[in-house]
A protein has these predicted regions:
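N-terminal glycine-rich anion-binding loops that anchor highly charged ligand groups
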Residues: 33
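Alpha-helical coiled-coil heptad-repeat segments
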Residues: 88-91
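Parallel, heptad-repeat alpha-helical coiled-coil signal-transduction segments
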Residues: 8-30, 43-86
Length: 91
């Protein structure tokens, strides 16, 4: 396999990975909005919605954790993509 082919394959993989991370970030944003809406509805329900409020809070926490993981992953992919491009330019 030629070096250019390997670099193209690595670059393509990084692009697909970047797209998948973007999709994860979109899902995280939707989850965050749903958690906020659930908190609002739990507050409206008063005491009867207290347990639902706890669940909504936990969903929000999970959403934030996903956000941090996706951000770290995106940074790693961007770094690898940049290195792949640098190697390609030097060839």
């Amino acid at each position: 396999m030629q070096d250019n082919t390997i670099l193209e394959l690595a670059y393509d993989i990084s692009q697909v990975t970047r797209e998948k991370v973007g999709a994860i970030e979109e899902i995280m944003q939707t989850t965050k909005i749903l958690a906020l809406n659930a908190r609002i509805e739990a507050a409206r329900a008063g005491t009867a919605g207290a347990a639902f409020g706890v669940v909504a809070e936990e969903i929000g926490n999970v959403s934030e954790e996903i956000n941090h993981i996706a951000s770290d992953f995106r940074d790693a992919v961007e770094g690898h993509t940049s290195r792949i491009e640098d190697v390609g330019e030097r060839m």
